[in-house]
């Protein structure tokens, strides 16, 4: 390590297959520039001579295969590690690349080289990533996805997020899926899997994604496992529909990021197993990756190894233990980023910094505040606001409100919980009345998110914050348990 000029500017020379790890404090930012060599952040390459900006308590690492020199301004907690799991992750990528090539050859009817024929019909990788809290599952998904799109074969794998506490490309509480055509950048925990095109206003971000989003509305899968199961299967139907229309694109495969509750012994084992099975069925999984958890690996081997490949992979030593307060701050960052865009102040002396390679001005938004009548928007809550587990009900008792029942929310009623609530605005319902059904809104995708910032009881009006000025009159929205907090 060397210092150049100011104490705020440092240079690190990294040896091959080492990584520079950093953790940012609240309110700080870090600018990194690749001086020479090659480097990547979770599989996304850095361009030489360009400043990359990180903020919002980002925790990440710059890895190099062949060695490099990097310069940074305003570092926080930082160190270099010679022990990384990247060789194991690269081997996984090579194995998945072979599966993609075989699947594509099968689609085109091309013969495989002698000795390369698999014992069964070649299938693309459909990967389920499991692991406990703070194991680095999302990072593994990001690295494998980035290596696929960098392979030069025009792969566009589908990246699926079924972790409602993460939010992925939209807001916390969402489950979503998106085809990935370019490397996913890392610059803020508010955008853990990159930026959606819907949050790029003035200039389309070159790596913007177009996700399909469903609304679960809570950070914890235990809150409503039946709804989780249904939404996972809805995502699976979207995957299958896409592959029916794009048989060649099917060869790119699917990578599924999961919540830590899928590996948690504190979660009801019955619910946990059902949700894992829902993912297995919905996405037709053929590979399970277990990140650093021996007991879970044995459990998956016993349950699924007869028809899928189960692989235990190492957890990175750079994974940071995240507490509950940090996760709540990240949820707040995500909601503000959805409404106002990504706003990170560059360190002094830097005027050309980028967020994941994109200009800072391209990622700033101006949301719209508008006043609507209570009756202009139909608002529902799925199930009762508080609901005991079925096992806690008296013997023979049944619920008055089922876990899957849409319950209308009246803004004029005290205790509605609407003030500062996050609402998921749904896509239009089926115009054919004969095709309607009671729980249809559970199967509708999300077209955007709203925040209720004020309730006027006497005027029977409410103020909503939205990313744009589009009308919401006559539309339907669902509320969950997330709330807006001013920064």
Swiss-Prot record:
UniProt GO cellular component terms: mRNA cleavage factor complex
Amino-acid positions noted as binding ATP in the UniProt annotation, renumbered to this chain: 19, 59, 134-139
UniProt-listed InterPro entries: Clp1 (IPR028606), Clp1/Grc3 (IPR045116), Clp1_C (IPR010655), Clp1_C_sf (IPR038238), Clp1_N (IPR032324), Clp1_N_sf (IPR038239), CLP1_P (IPR032319), P-loop_NTPase (IPR027417)
Location within or outside the cell: Nucleus
SUPFAM superfamilies: P-loop containing nucleoside triphosphate hydrolases
Pfam families per the UniProt record, alphabetical: Clp1, CLP1_N, CLP1_P
UniProt entry keywords in alphabetical sequence: ATP-binding, mRNA processing, Nucleotide-binding, Nucleus
GO MF annotation list: ATP binding; polynucleotide 5'-hydroxyl-kinase activity
GO process annotations (BP): mRNA 3'-end processing; tRNA splicing, via endonucleolytic cleavage and ligation
Its biological purpose: Required for endonucleolytic cleavage during polyadenylation-dependent pre-mRNA 3'-end formation.
Assembly: Component of a pre-mRNA cleavage factor complex. Interacts directly with PCF11.
Record-stated family: Belongs to the Clp1 family. Clp1 subfamily.
Listed name of the protein: mRNA cleavage and polyadenylation factor CLP1
Source organism of the structure: Laccaria bicolor (strain S238N-H82 / ATCC MYA-4686)
């Amino acid at each position: 390590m060397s210092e150049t000029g100011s104490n705020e500017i440092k240079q690190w020379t990294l040896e091959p297959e080492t990584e520079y790890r950093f953790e940012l404090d609240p309110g700080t930012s870090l600018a990194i520039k690749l001086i020479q060599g090659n480097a990547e952040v979770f599989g996304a390459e850095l361009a030489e001579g360009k400043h990359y900006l990180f903020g919002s308590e980002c925790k990440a690492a710059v890895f190099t295969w062949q060695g490099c020199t990097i310069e940074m301004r305003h570092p926080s907690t930082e160190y270099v590690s010679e022990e990384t799991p990247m060789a194991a992750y690269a081997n996984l990528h090579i194995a998945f690349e072979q599966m993609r090539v075989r699947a594509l050859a099968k689609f085109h009817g091309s013969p495989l080289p002698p000795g390369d024929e698999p014992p069964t019909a070649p299938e693309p990788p459909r990967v389920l990533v499991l692991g406990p809290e703070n194991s680095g599952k999302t990072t593994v998904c990001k690295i494998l996805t980035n290596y696929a799109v960098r392979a030069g074969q025009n792969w566009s794998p589908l990246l699926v997020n079924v972790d409602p506490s993460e939010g992925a490309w939209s807001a916390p509480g969402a489950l979503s899926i998106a085809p990935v055509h370019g490397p996913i950048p890392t610059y803020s925990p508010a955008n853990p899997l990159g930026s959606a095109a819907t949050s790029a206003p003035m200039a389309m971000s070159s790596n913007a994604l177009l996700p399909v989003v469903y609304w679960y509305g809570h950070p914890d899968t235990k809150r409503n496992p039946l709804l989780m199961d249904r939404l996972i299967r809805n995502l699976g139907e979207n995957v299958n529909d896409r592959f029916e229309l794009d048989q060649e694109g099917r060869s790119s495969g699917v990578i599924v990021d999961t919540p830590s509750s899928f590996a948690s012994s504190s979660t009801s084992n019955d619910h946990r197993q059902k949700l894992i099975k829902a993912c297995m069925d919905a996405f037709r999984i053929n590979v399970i990756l277990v990140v650093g958890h021996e007991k879970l690996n044995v459990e998956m081997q016993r349950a699924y190894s007869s028809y899928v490949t189960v692989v235990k992979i190492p957890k990175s030593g750079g994974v940071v233990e995240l507490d509950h307060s940090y996760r709540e701050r990240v949820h707040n960052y995500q909601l503000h980023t959805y409404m106002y865009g990504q706003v990170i102040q560059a360190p002094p002396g830097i005027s050309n910094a980028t967020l994941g390679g994109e200009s800072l001005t391209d990622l700033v938004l101006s949301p719209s505040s508008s006043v609507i009548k209570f009756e202009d928007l139909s608002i529902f809550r799925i199930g009762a606001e508080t609901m005991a587990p079925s096992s806690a009900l008296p013997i023979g008792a049944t619920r008055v409100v089922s876990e899957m029942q849409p319950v209308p929310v009246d803004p004029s009623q005290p205790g509605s919980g609407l003030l500062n609530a996050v609402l998921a605005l749904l896509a239009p319902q089926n115009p054919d009345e004969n095709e309607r059904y009671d729980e249809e809104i559970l199967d509708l995708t999300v077209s955007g998110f709203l925040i209720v910032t004020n309730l006027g009881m006497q005027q029977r009006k409410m103020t909503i914050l939205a990313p744009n000025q589009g009308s919401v009159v006559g539309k339907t929205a669902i509320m969950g348990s997330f709330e807006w907090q001013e920064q």
